[in-house]
A protein has these predicted regions:
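Primarily the internal scaffold of c-type cytochrome electron-transfer domains
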Residues: 1-12, 41-73, 95-99, 108
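Electrostatic cytochrome c docking/interface patches
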Residues: 2-30
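Short glycine/proline-rich turn/loop motifs
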Residues: 19, 98-103
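The canonical Cys-X-X-Cys-His
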Residues: 25, 32-42, 118
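Protein kinase-like catalytic domain
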Residues: 29, 39, 86-89, 126
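Electron-transfer interface patches adjacent to heme c in soluble/periplasmic c-type cytochromes
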Residues: 33, 53-90, 103-116
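Substrate-binding/catalytic groove segments of enzymes
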Residues: 36, 45-47, 76-80, 90-97
Length: 126
């Protein structure tokens, strides 16, 4: 089994790591908040489909779908995204539920500046 992990890593793990001069929004989203872990679909081996970055995925519980937060689909402003991440309220006054409620609980402790950096990253996903 352990040798299979090495094969998986060689196929799917990025070799580059976040460096000292990395863009702070990239660091916040990809390293700390790890938004893509839920919002990016996976292949049959459990690796993220990077060509569908942040385009939504099946819910691991088997019920429903994790929504796309790709800018083609999520039409919120940066300020609305930052507000959602700090309060859990959508622009339509819906509330974050499930695991996202836990994410909001943790992200709400970040500064407004950091939340806007996360929102900026999300608005600029290609």
């Amino acid at each position: 089994m352990r040798s299979n992990v090495g094969v998986w890593k060689s196929l799917f793990m990025k070799e580059e790591f976040v460096g000292d001069n990395e863009n702070p929004s990239t660091y916040l989203v990809e390293a700390l908040a790890h938004c893509s872990e839920c919002h990016t679909p996976r292949n049959m081996f459990g690796a993220m489909k990077t060509k569908q970055w942040m385009r939504g995925a099946s819910n691991p519980s088997g019920k429903g779908k994790i929504p796309s937060i790709h800018p083609d689909d999520l039409k919120w402003t940066k300020e609305e995204i930052a507000e959602y991440l700090s309060s859990g309220l959508t622009p339509n006054y819906d509330v974050a539920g499930g695991n996202m409620a836990l994410v909001v609980e943790n992200l709400s402790k970040l500064s407004k500046e950091d939340l806007l950096l996360i929102a900026s990253y999300i608005k600029n996903v290609k």
